Curated annotation (Swiss-Prot):
Residues 533-591 are annotated as: Disordered. This is Inactive metallocarboxypeptidase ECM14. The gene is ECM14. Keywords: Cell wall biogenesis/degradation, Disulfide bond, Glycoprotein, Metal-binding, Secreted, Signal, Vacuole, Zinc. One of its GO terms (molecular function) is zinc ion binding. SUPFAM superfamilies: Protease propeptides/inhibitors (SSF54897), Zn-dependent exopeptidases (SSF53187). Binds 1 zinc ion per subunit. It is found in: Vacuole; Secreted. Belongs to the peptidase M14 family. Residues 1-21 form the signal peptide. Residues 22-175 form a propeptide. Glycans are attached at N350, N381, N386. It comes from Paracoccidioides brasiliensis (strain Pb18). Zn(2+) binds at H265, E268, H397. Residues 203-523 form the Peptidase M14 domain.
Length: 591
């Protein structure tokens, strides 16, 4: 049976063109008729004749799924104009004419059709919410995809990224910035650094820079920082982490510990930078902020910039959009396991275990992903042998700006401490919004990965676009009994997707630093969320004077730009500012 599955995968791959992704800077829109869909992406010259495999693929789709021929074949006579590309030829060769489309979903039939078509064509689903789904694919595949979808979806989509190679090219650090790094070096200061001085967060950093930076922090702040190793990767690299806290001597009680992890999916660079930013902010503010000092005296914080160093390095050196780790699978040309689908709790790999080419491939068995297994063993050893009590787990991802709590595998049953999970999640969302005005939606993880029929007043959920069993979120919550476990999807909402510009690194880091402060104050029991120390420059949003409205421009009820003091929270009406202030909180529809 396994051999038959592999042969089936090989046959389908032989009939499919390589699938890449969508970037865009064009202002085109799809025509109303689905047969004209491909003309959305204009060209400077007539298209070259279709290759043998592309024509074979189109023929297979036409025959098996009865797709009209005009939807499966490019029209070589079509002419248009293409913008000039500055991306290197190597990027153009790898990503070709890949695009990212956003489909608006309205009912269960549309979701099911989109999920089935994505599986048939081996498409890369970038993100999904209860309103839309972003899919990366080659322009050659667009007609085939539309032909597999109902008519309602053939016209309810827009292009998000038209030119993936160019967008990828612009996401890498510029040569001028790299030269400035070589001259100035990375020197954390005991005083709060300006953006110009703290150049580490002016751009994304490769793994070869992150590790020495972590060592430097450890040597400079040895009183409250240690560098530890979580385990080893498939390719033999260490998985480094920073342990931050003030360890009391001869304390028999278990040490309460918060884990913040990023980079499980290699292409989500903003999660790596954000973990580093939050760690750096706690480290450098220990001697300046009494609230930070209190937290580090009560809790240990473990910051893991990337659980997937092999994959992260691969995104820098080979494929910027790579998602999985780099371990071998049963198919030599389809390496990698999805490190957020391979955990042991409610692992549902029986559905996708025979397809190593899937972006969500969970491996052949629970904990088949080496890095996830190493992480779980480290966590168990900490609780069993090192007097550690894990009280919170935050798993940073991108994108879509969502705060998700358990469970991911299913919306039934509810987690036992649902109300507390929701309360803290709302507080985190509020802290984020009051930092830089960004809105994060709060929901259970199962709802965040499917569409809901709230708009049509039904309690029945839509089918899922992606399988969600075997997540780190559920494992930490259920198997390790970490009561406050969250998965946070960072910026943005799809304009750039995984290729978020470097200008978002510091603002996103500020938002998550304040989120961690709220988490810590909540766990400390300081009157709910406790006060945020807005006197610390690291917690205040850095807005230009032109961005701050004058008094006559401010609505007396609009405090979104003003640093929020949680000490005054009890003076407000209970619940004020949550649902009424449109913070994106969606309560569970079924209790």
């Amino acid at each position: 049976m396994r051999l038959f599955s592999h042969l089936a995968v090989l046959a389908i791959l032989a009939c499919a063109v390589p699938i890449t992704a969508i970037p865009s800077f064009l202002s085109n829109s799809y025509p109303a008729h689905p047969a004209e869909g491909i003309s959305l992406f204009p060209q400077t010259q007539p298209q070259a004749p279709l290759g043998l495999w592309t024509r074979l693929r189109n023929t297979v789709i036409e025959r098996l799924w009865r797709v009209p021929p005009q939807l499966c074949k490019n029209r070589p006579g079509h002419k248009g104009k293409f913008p000039l590309f500055s991306a290197p030829a190597s990027l153009r060769a790898r990503y070709g004419d890949d695009v990212v489309l956003r489909f608006t979903i309205r009912n269960a039939e549309e979701v099911k059709a989109l999920a089935e078509a994505s599986n048939i064509l081996f498409l890369d689903v970038w993100a999904s919410t209860d309103e839309w789904v972003d899919i990366r694919l080659s322009k050659d595949v667009v007609p085939s995809l539309l032909g597999l979808l109902p008519k309602s979806l053939q016209t309810s989509h827009i292009p998000l990224i038209h030119d993936l190679p160019q967008t990828i090219y612009e996401s890498y650090p510029s040569s001028s910035q790299r030269s400035s790094y070589d001259v100035q070096g990375f020197s954390p200061s005991t005083k709060h650094s300006s953006d110009k001085t703290n150049i580490f967060f002016q751009d994304y950093q490769p793994f070869s820079v992150i590790v020495p930076w972590m060592r430097l922090l450890t040597s400079m702040f040895s009183s409250h920082v240690q560098m530890i190793n979580i385990g080893s990767t498939f390719e033999g690299r260490d998985i480094p982490a920073l342990q931050i806290g003030v360890w009391p001597a001869n304390n028999p009680k278990p040490r309460k510990t918060v884990v913040v992890s990023g980079g499980s999916h290699a292409r989500e660079w903003i999660s790596v930078s954000t973990v580093n930013y939050v760690a750096y902010s706690l480290i450098t503010n220990y001697a300046k902020s009494k609230h930070v000092a209190e937290l580090l005296q009560q809790f240990d914080f473990i910051f893991i910039p990337t659980l997937n160093p092999d994959g992260y390095i691969y995104t820098w050196e080979v494929d910027r959009i790579w998602r999985k780790n780099r371990q071998d699978t049963s198919l030599p040309f389809c390496p990698g396991v999805d490190l957020d689908r391979t955990w042991g709790f409610k692992w549902d790999g029986n559905i996708t275990a025979d397809n190593p080419c899937s972006e969500s491939y969970p491996g052949e068995d629970p904990f088949a992903g080496i890095e996830a297994k190493q992480f779980s063993q480290w966590a168990k050893n900490q609780t069993a042998q090192n007097n550690t009590e894990f009280v919170a787990f935050i798993d940073l991802h991108s994108y879509s700006q969502q705060i998700r709590y358990p469970y991911s595998y299913s919306c039934q049953p509810d987690p036992p401490n649902l109300e507390n999970l929701e309360e803290l999640a709302i507080g985190i969302a509020k802290a984020i919004r009051l930092t830089n005005r960004e809105t994060y939606e709060v929901s259970s993880a199962c709802e965040g990965l499917m569409a809901s029929q709230a708009k049509v007043k039904s309690d029945d959920p839509f089918p899922r676009i992606e399988r969600t069993g075997g997540s780190a979120l559920d494992w930490f919550y259920h198997d390790l009994n970490v009561k406050y476990s969250y998965q946070i999807k960072l910026r943005d909402r799809g304009s750039y997707g995984f290729l978020l510009p470097r200008e978002n690194i510091v603002p996103t880091g500020q938002e998550m630093f304040n989120a961690v402060m709220v988490l810590g104050r909540f766990l400390s029991g300081h009157d709910g969320f406790g006060p945020l120390d807005w006197e610390d420059e690291s917690q205040r949003p850095k807005a230009d004077e032109d961005d701050i409205p004058s008094e006559n421009e401010l609505d007396e009820n609009d405090d979104s730009w003003i640093p929020y003091d949680y000490r005054n929270h009890d003076d407000q009406n209970e619940g004020e500012g949550y649902d009424n202030d449109e913070w994106g909180f969606r309560r569970r529809r079924k209790r």
